[in-house]
Amino acid sequence: MKIIITLLAISAIVYSGCQQSRLVPQPLNFTENPVDVPNPDRGFYRPQTFVLPVESDTVPRLTNLSTTIAGTDVWVDARIVYMAFDLKNFSSNAPLNGLPLGEWSPEGARPPEYGKTQPLTPAALDYVRAALQNLRDSEAVAIVKFSYDGRGYTYNNRGGYDLPLHDCEPGAPQGRVWYETGVEEESDLCGIPGHEEKNWVQYHMWQLGHVFSEFEDVIMVVKGGLFGPWGEMHSSSYARTAEGYHWLLNALLGYVPESRSILVHAGGVMAWHNVEYGTNYSFTNLMPAPAPGTPAQRFGMRNDSYSKGGEGYTDGGSLSEGFRLIGGDYDRNAALTWIRNQNNFYGGETVRSGNEPENMYPRFPNVPYEAAYARTTHLNTSYSSAAYVNWADFIYTEENITAPFTPPHDGVTRTAIFDPVYDGKNGMEYMRDRMGFRLVLREAMASESVNQTGTLRFEGKIQNVGFGLIVNKKNVSVLLKPKSGSSHFAALTDIDARDWRPDLDSRATNTSAWRDVRFSIDMGAFGDVPPGEYDIYLKINDPKETSATKRSIRFANYDIWNADLGANRIGSVKVTS
């Protein structure tokens, strides 16, 4: 296939030229197709664990992207892999194969084996690279997490216990030695020449930072999961201090590419902000929406018990995590507002609270109502079936979805909005399709004809009917493809797809939520375009994407996606000489 690409920045809003052909309506279908539309950076994810080896003895493989969602028969073609990298082999405080001994241990039990605190070896780093290269070769992007206790062995929640045991991070003060002797570690510094000021976690982050940069194109977001069991940022000595969050988040801000965000939680971010900037934010003195491009705006939210509700309405502690570091107060509405204000990624996994018949939080209509407000972007395909079966059993009708409900955390009666596009579908199909962004072309006007030396113009409207935003910057290019032939011509615009923001009302009739998409492009930017009839396409992908068509954003319209181009047809034009 012949491809001629000229990467020139083209004004998306300023029109040039003296004699312009008139704009004419394009004969396209501007309605939404209510089906699974696979796109990067949003939707259900496939979880996968990788244990970093000390020596090269294993080859990482990637999980299948397509699956049925747990507890349902709803199919999804996922475009996110949650890559949980376990660093347990590189911490002397990380049990390798079981819980530390305690009153729960059977008679004659032996203690577990432990890792060894040391730098990440070349084999370990190459293993991460190989896993991310497998991902790059697929159609997916990654949520990347590194932790020291992926199996949660330093927290006993088995057999009726609910007890943190000891720190899992290398060098942490209350690790294995403290657990066995009561004596804390004197220092957590790594002692590596040239890095004497770094503790072991910071040093490992420094090592991994090089890998982050190499695979920036396929990393959706990095989860700040280095503290505590399961990497859930609780229970560890480090996670119990504002200073711990301060040095960790600063390290992540430094080592994660500037174009990528970091998932933590509201309490930890406000604790970091209070130390870094001398503020006094809390759930009753909420941190305001940070300015785009600032360090504070790079933080999204990971919820490990999404929509659980539960005691204190904290989602099992996920929404309130870190509240003791910022004044000891908590409010569910404030937590959700903080998430919304961050204009970033929000998601995680549900839990077994679906088995609680009186709990409205993991049920419709509360689930989509809160998801739209907090701008939910991603959830786990595998966990938990107990919650997901309720979503699949819910029939999405106007009567069902608009039934008033009153969450007990504030006693305010709410009503969700009915979108007739999904009438008769089930709740899981609605959640599958609405998570993150979902773009529908609503209007299209293009130049009827354009001279080879003229200016191609387009004016249209796009509606983001999803819950969430386009968070990561994308290139938006215009392609011209002859109606007969396989070549195409491309020009890069300066359109910012992140401006296509969602609205709480996603219905097509809400024209105030339709966002402008306009461009005016000198034909010379495409190169030497022969006269003829052309289709106009919009291609949206990551600026550092290395493939021709992978990970391009697909609109949810009928009959406009071209898989060979990885682009959406938005009209046609006649090029004249």
Regions found by a protein language model. Name each.
Residues 1-7:
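Sec-dependent signal peptide recognition
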Residues 7-8, 14-30:
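Bacterial Sec-dependent N-terminal signal peptides
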Residues 23-129, 147, 153-188, 192, ...:
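N-terminal substrate-binding region of glycoside hydrolase catalytic domains
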Residues 34-52, 57, 221-400:
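Catalytic-core regions of glycoside hydrolase
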Residues 76-80, 137-142, 215-221, 256-262, ...:
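Loop/turn elements at helix/coil->beta-strand transitions in domains of secreted/extracellular proteins
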Residues 107, 113-131, 195-208, 240-251, ...:
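Well-ordered, non-membrane alpha-helical segments in soluble/globular domains
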Residues 123-141, 164-221, 244-255:
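An active-site-proximal structural segment forming one wall of the substrate-binding cleft
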Residues 425, 429-577:
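Extracellular/luminal regions of secreted and cell-surface proteins that mediate adhesion/ECM remodeling
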